[in-house]
């Protein structure tokens, strides 16, 4: 195999003195996989092309937003037409209302919605709303669940924080961190203990209904139902962070897929069609507490801007229930291919999937929480990642991130990926003497 990264290496060297780590988001530095970042030049459908001329089947999809693949022609045309009219005005547009109607129609928990500019903004605003609505202070989250980089949520977070081996972030005051409780994901007993001790001051529970930032880890049967019951019994709000799972796991998001309705939902990624968007919404009586209708303040200069609204609206409008049936079929085939290759070459493996999200761990232990995710062989993942990139498969450069499918991925793409996995696992068997 010949794999050239000459131009990417040069571009990274140029970037490093100008931006912290040479990147604008930590995981893009590729530190955990020990290689030069892949500098993208263009995308088309299920493919991304780097500045060295390498072509990849893309399972990153800009970390999830591109559910229709790169440069979907309908979305591209809609963005171009809106850009001719203007891209931000600082006053309402009809597009915001159309987008709100669509989101409310699709998401079971949302009766009113507020648009913001990122998933982090959405989760921060949802926590403020939960505290303001309940009059309580503390929030319960789960180890390994990442809810953006807001101070009160960078406590035992997953994703890039897990990749860097940092349990928390410097700069988060201990006094602020003390308002955030953490328990293991999929552990209802631990949740009950937390409520027994702090229930009078717990404003809410925030959870990824299917965790995507410790690798991909779905909820165990009864876990989400248990959270719904416990929060209702204790007067706390249940907040689903569906920034990643929203419109990815199912047509009606993860809450529709798993059949559990929260009080508040945070959205992002897919709802922007690849442009910066976030949103939070929920029961009308709760959302009516947001300014200017209520006393809880939240605002944003570019919130609901027409370019993001048209990209998101056009993306969501194209998604139909049958697309999710195809996602299930293709993700199932991908999981089957990984599993068969793992068994054939004696590679430790565990696979998880739901809708268009897929996860693979280099461990024989069934991964149900962050501690088990951390048992994965990171040295093996590092070698695997480099070999797969050289074979033209673009994966998230972290063991603690999930993979994404798009409507542009074909059966041929899936089979090519499985063939690359087979060849890579064969080499790993020899490299690690398995």
Curated annotation (Swiss-Prot):
GO terms for molecular function: glutamate-1-semialdehyde 2,1-aminomutase activity; pyridoxal phosphate binding; transaminase activity. It catalyses: (S)-4-amino-5-oxopentanoate = 5-aminolevulinate. PROSITE patterns: AA_TRANSFER_CLASS_3. It is found in: Cytoplasm. Its main location: cytoplasm. Its cofactor is pyridoxal 5'-phosphate. One of its GO terms (cellular component) is cytoplasm. It is an enzyme of class 5 (isomerase). Pathway: Porphyrin-containing compound metabolism; protoporphyrin-IX biosynthesis; 5-aminolevulinate from L-glutamyl-tRNA(Glu): step 2/2. GO terms for biological process: protoporphyrinogen IX biosynthetic process. Its EC number is 5.4.3.8. It holds the Pfam family Aminotran_3. The modification N6-(pyridoxal phosphate)lysine is found at residue 269. Keywords: Cytoplasm, Isomerase, Porphyrin biosynthesis, Pyridoxal phosphate. CDD domains: OAT_like. HAMAP family: HemL_aminotrans_3. Homodimer. Belongs to the class-III pyridoxal-phosphate-dependent aminotransferase family. HemL subfamily. This is Glutamate-1-semialdehyde 2,1-aminomutase 2. It comes from Exiguobacterium sp. (strain ATCC BAA-1283 / AT1b).
